Amino acid sequence: MKFSYFLLLLLSLSNFQNNPVAMLDTIACIENKDTCRLKNCPRLHNVVGTCYEGKGKCCHKN
């Protein structure tokens, strides 16, 4: 019984991801102190790149 719980724990931990949306473009955007948005950037912000594997926009404040 304890062994089956241990196997279930290992299976659960193997499928766990720390941050599944943090890809290279997202990390680069955040390191430049910009913000990631899924839709349009707020007013007074420029689009300077992408986030979330091209699905979002990296916004830089003017």
From Swiss-Prot:
Only expressed in epididymis (corpus and cauda). Belongs to the beta-defensin family. Keywords: Antibiotic, Antimicrobial, Defensin, Disulfide bond, Secreted, Signal. GO terms for cellular component: extracellular region. GO terms for biological process: defense response to bacterium. The gene is Defb37. Has antibacterial activity. It comes from the Eukaryota. This is Beta-defensin 37. It holds the Pfam family Defensin_beta. The keyword Repeat does not apply. InterPro entries: Defensin_beta-like. Residues 1-16 form the signal peptide. It comes from Mus musculus. PANTHER family: BETA-DEFENSIN 37 (PTHR21388:SF12), BETA-DEFENSIN-RELATED (PTHR21388). Disulfide bonds join 29-58, 36-51, 41-59. The keyword Disulfide bond applies. It is found in: Secreted.
